[in-house]
Amino acid sequence: MSETVIPPKEITGVILAGGRAQRMGGVDKGLILLNGKPMVAHVIAALRAEIDNLLINANRNLEQYATFGYPVIPDIMDGYLGPLAGIASGMRAASSRYIVTAPCDSPLVANNLVRRLYEALIREGADISVAHDGERMHPVFALMRRDLLPSLLDFLNAGQRKIDRWYAQHRLAVAYFRDQPEAFRNVNSPEERAELESELEVTPR
């Protein structure tokens, strides 16, 4: 079966870096070094291998994030409301038909993340496609129609925050990455960062 061709101008990547990083002692996770590069740089490189247009959603250190060469957009709603607020910001700022999201603290991004998510969405005629590692879903790795923004804003304005509940309101497809379960590993503490860096020194990626 031939591979689906990604329409590059129809998908914008949104890197979610807007959290408080409380378990990291408040240090901005996307800017923490892993193998000599900020974690967000690893995510940028992976997404740029598939698509051209990227946005970075951040609520702190905006000037530092801007040095990576992509537009930096804060949450459109105050209060650190979680990933949905960042997704809404990305939808509003993008001009493409779809957005694809990935968090800044998961630097081992899957090969062909965008293509597999896009294939699942098109195949199922879905509104949103979400990554699944074979054991569980990873809802912040997702591709979705940008015209879902009004629905998302209604959800947030109603005081709702849970990403799974909003997804449940729409047609959902699942893209499986059983061959790359490590791709969804995230770094939430200095200890986890040190552990991952040690592993990468032994088995470079």
Predicted regions and their residues:
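Nucleotide and nucleotide-moiety/phosphate-recognizing core
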Residues: 3-160, 165-183, 190-204
